[in-house]
Amino acid sequence: MKILVIGDSCKDVFIYGTANRLCPEAPVPVFIPKRKTETGGMAANVYENIESLGIEVDLITNQEVITKTRYVEEKTNHQIIRVDSDANKSQRVEGLEHIPYSDYCAVIISDYNKGFLEYDDIEYICSKHDTVFIDTKKIVNEKMLGAKFIKINEHE
């Protein structure tokens, strides 16, 4: 069994610490960082989850590094703020016509609408494989109807 994941990826950074007082200059919490974790996010998270199940998986994703850094109060696990860097647009995917789709038992499209995949790309992928799962932030349209499953997301 081999699965292909295609879509936008990011690096998810979590900085855990404490925020026990307000800043004297402005009514904002003073955050004291204690530990940091990093994981793959978006399509990279899908890839890591599938890989953790022992399933062979390939990932086609953006080259640009999009980072989402969350500052989390460690006692309550509440996010205080999220800081995004380079999160506007990804370079569009290239080479979809060169992928050996028949080598995969399924294709997962993880589209966060950052520009890596356009509607025509999704339609093309759906035309090349019988088992396509779509998780998208785009408005679902007729170009996606070739997919087996579609998960709809709210706008972030």
Q: Can you describe what each PLM-predicted range is?
A:
Residues 31:
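Central beta-strand plus flanking loop segment that forms part of the substrate or channel wall
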Residues 1-22, 26, 34-156:
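Ribokinase/PfkB-type carbohydrate-kinase core domain
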